[in-house]
Regions:
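A conserved ligand/cofactor-binding region detector
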Residues: 1-753
Length: 753
């Protein structure tokens, strides 16, 4: 049967009379069958990538591309008068992640399958994700983000595992979601849930009874931890994930002939950040039940497990009060105590203990002591870990530390989300970059070719128009496509410094009012969610929404400046924003961003980076050269020194600089107060003057100058700008997750061996 006949056999009627929902379900079933054909037997070592998040995005187009069916599906549907793009709108986006951590995990699964490596994900089947963001009266509101339907990519299985929480046994059910590689194998994302979850207990936004564990355990990713019940619920979640996951791993390995003593020959377990850390004592406990003594179990688990550190922020290195673990996982505490005792025989440094003097259990410490590898996710990040944040551990275990710079899957972030650029590239350098991202370097041969540069300009212009159409349709916002599209889309956090961008926009507002007109209009686009209990982050959102209203109401300013905040930013929105971006905002405080991957996605799609020397920005700069990126601000060494000296006083910068003072005071000026809420604006105003922990003010003037240079280059040297864009695309190959996964496999996992 041809494609049309196959699809009609699934719908039971001609495609032309099918609804988009019927066609979506038929395509889902077709993809499932084709994916199943690519499942391969596992020999040797298999990876289990355990992560609290998998931000996989919509899957229909991605799977059709990876299976080589996209063009066929699009054409068959078009012949029946149907649009694949319209059918994609029917698909709900899975609410299984939030930020870069979860998106990285999703890219890694894609690359594992594409490289024909045996590697499955292990996580939780959240019903409502983080939350669905809406803006009401200028503030962020949170609601459930439902995505589970009767027909989902994640298929229910009959496989269950008992999990003991607070002395009570729960039954974890396994759901399997097929992960299809590009011209590669099919792996699996294993997601655990409870049959007893009750979605109806959620009320008043995202409030629910945090003590009703049987009903609430997998409702939300990262339950609000502003109270003790929420913090304990996170421990419950983490143990459900690792206990069910560990039982799955042991069962699968045993089915392949493992006798448990040789577990490390059958499994490689990657602990993605500290959320899955309890897999270490849980595996030791389960191996003990198989008759393996403690010392051997520790040796087996250490050889099997590896840990990825994703943060330099101390607040994000999880430390649970012992009382929580005593209450929720009492079966693990004797094991954790023995691990702490064993760790103390290796070092006298109290700072490296697992259980500290305040009776807190340090998850990252347990990970480093009892895995065989600890990696950072960008060269700078790993050096900071070794020389600063985890220096004591590096001195104790230098052989464990290594770097694996993050990457992104080009299948989603180029082939799927930017088909126009993909076609343009294939016209000039062939299609080899689809599997070998390094082939993008061939584009450098066209760096002086005005015809090619003009074609790239046309692609970007079309993508900007497509984004403008989408913004009008989904956000009811009209934007000027002749303006520079300046985009900062990432989790809302003070260290990522959306507040620096905010102060710049206020500065520009004043400059325009004073008659100092910019070289080109600017549309500044934000996409970000703030954690529900993160007050200042929500205040930053409010300030940006309020500023947007103030500017829109001022015709003198609005023709030069516009602020747009995307509601409910997710992967689908990112796929619209990234191809249309001119200037990519990567402005975290140097030394604070472990890597970042948004910077890579924007670069790949021909945006230029405005950024600090932080995270993977450093390596982007090395790849493209300083002339093809806009770097500003303090270095990581300068920032670390300033923290060590303890002498940063934001008030001195505020008092000593008229531009800074004007920008901050505008937050509580009459224009903003008339459009916004005094409580939110005053709190942010005071925070910037009296705290500013992430050093916004010392970098402010350098940011204003560098951004001005970028906008002038765009306006005054369009061909030079486009050449810089071409170089960025050509040098993006290093940031493929295929390269990253190849390095993990070579140095840590040794899969299939």
């Amino acid at each position: 049967m041809n494609f049309t006949e196959t699809l009609q056999s699934l719908t039971g009627k001609p495609l032309s009379v099918c609804t988009n929902q019927e066609l979506y379900l038929a395509l889902l079933e077709l993809v499932r069958r084709k994916s199943a054909d690519r499942v391969q037997p596992v020999t040797g070592r298999k990876l289990y990538y355990i992560s609290a998040e998998f931000l996989i995005g919509k899957l229909l187009s991605n799977n059709l591309i990876n299976l080589g069916l996209y063009d066929e599906a699009r054409d068959a549907l078009a012949a029946a008068g149907k649009s694949l793009a319209d059918i994609e709108e029917v698909e709900p986006e899975p609410s299984l992640g939030n930020g870069g951590l979860g998106r990285l995990a999703a890219c890694f699964l894609d690359s594992l399958a594409t490289l024909n490596l045996p590697g499955d994900g292990v996580g939780l089947r959240y019903h409502f994700g983080l939350f669905r963001q809406s803006f009401e009266n200028g503030v962020q509101n949170e609601k459930p983000d439902p995505w589970l339907t009767a027909h989902s990519w994640a298929e229910k299985t009959d496989i269950t595992y008992p999990v003991e929480l607070a002395g009570k046994e729960y039954t974890a059910r396994l759901y399997k979601l097929a992960v299809t590689g590009y011209e590669g194998r099919t792996n699996t994302l294993n997601l655990f849930d409870l049959d007893t979850i009750d979605e109806s207990i959620v009320h008043d936004g995202i409030a629910f009874d945090k003590t009703a564990i049987d009903k609430n355990l997998t409702l939300f990713l990262y339950p609000d931890d502003s109270d003790e019940a929420g913090r304990r619920l996170r421990v419950y979640q983490q143990y459900l994930m690792v206990s069910a996951g560990a039982q799955l791993i042991l069962a699968e390995c045993a089915a392949r002939g493992c006798n448990y003593h040789d577990l490390a020959d059958y499994a490689a377990i990657q602990i993605n950040d500290t959320h899955p850390s309890m897999v270490i004592p849980e595996l030791i406990r389960l191996l003990g039940e198989k008759g393996i003594d403690f010392d051997e179990a520790v040796e087996i688990v250490t050889k099997t497990c590896a840990y990825t550190n994703h943060t330099i922020l101390a607040e994000a290195l999880e430390k649970w009060p012992r009382s929580y673990l005593d209450a929720v996982v009492p079966q693990l505490m004797p094991i954790i105590e023995k691990l702490d005792t064993l760790a103390r025989t290796r070092t006298e440094d109290e700072g490296l203990a697992i259980i500290d003097k305040d009776d807190r259990v340090h998850m990252a410490h347990m990970d480093i002591h009892f895995t065989h590898s600890t990696n950072g996710v960008a060269a700078l990040h790993t050096e900071i870990l070794k020389n600063s944040e985890l220096h004591g551990f590096y001195e104790l275990y230098p052989e464990k530390f290594n770097n694996k710079t993050n990457g992104i899957t080009f299948r989603r972030w180029l082939l799927e989300c930017d088909p126009a650029l993909t076609a343009e590239l294939e016209q000039h350098i062939g299609s080899g970059f689809r599997k070998d991202a390094a082939e993008l370097e061939k584009l450098l041969a066209f760096a002086e070719d005005e015809t090619v540069l003009n074609e790239l300009t046309a692609v970007k212009k079309a993508n900007k128009q497509a984004l403008a159409d989408w913004l009008l349709h989904t956000q009811n916002v009209t934007v000027n496509t002749d303006a520079v599209f300046d985009i900062q889309s990432k989790r809302l956090h003070e260290y990522k410094r959306q507040q620096l961008n905010l102060l710049y926009l206020i500065h520009q507002y004043h400059e325009i009012k004073a008659g100092h007109l910019p070289a080109v209009p600017l549309v500044s686009i934000f996409g970000a969610k703030a954690a529900p209990a993160y007050t200042i982050a929500k205040d930053i959102i409010h300030a940006l929404l309020t500023l947007s209203k103030v500017i829109a109401a001022d015709p003198e300013v609005s023709k030069w400046l516009q602020v747009v905040f995307i509601e409910n930013y997710n992967v689908t929105a990112a796929e619209k924003l990234i191809p249309a971006c001119d200037l990519s905002e990567q402005i975290s405080l140097a030394s604070k961003e472990a890597s970042g991957t948004g910077n890579m996605k924007f670069m790949l799609n021909g945006a230029l980076t405005l950024g600090t020397m932080d995270g993977a920005n450093v390596e982007i700069c090395q790849q493209v050269g300083e002339e093809n990126i806009y770097i500003f601000g303090q270095t990581s060494d300068q920032v670390i020194h300033r923290y060590a000296a303890g002498d940063y006083c934001a008030a001195q910068w505020y008092e000593g600089d008229a531009n800074i003072r004007r920008a901050i005071d505008f937050l509580t000026g009459p224009e903003m107060l008339a459009a916004g809420h005094a409580e939110n604006l005053t709190r942010l105003h005071d925070e910037l003057i009296h705290k500013d922990w992430f050093q916004t003010l010392p970098d402010f003037n350098a940011y204003v100058v560098r951004k001005g240079q970028a906008l002038n280059d765009y306006a005054c040297d369009p061909l030079g700008w486009r050449k810089k864009c071409l170089v960025n695309i050509a040098k993006a190959g290093f940031f493929s997750s295929d390269r990253t996964i190849g390095e993990y496999d070579r140095d840590i996992w040794h899969l299939g061996q």
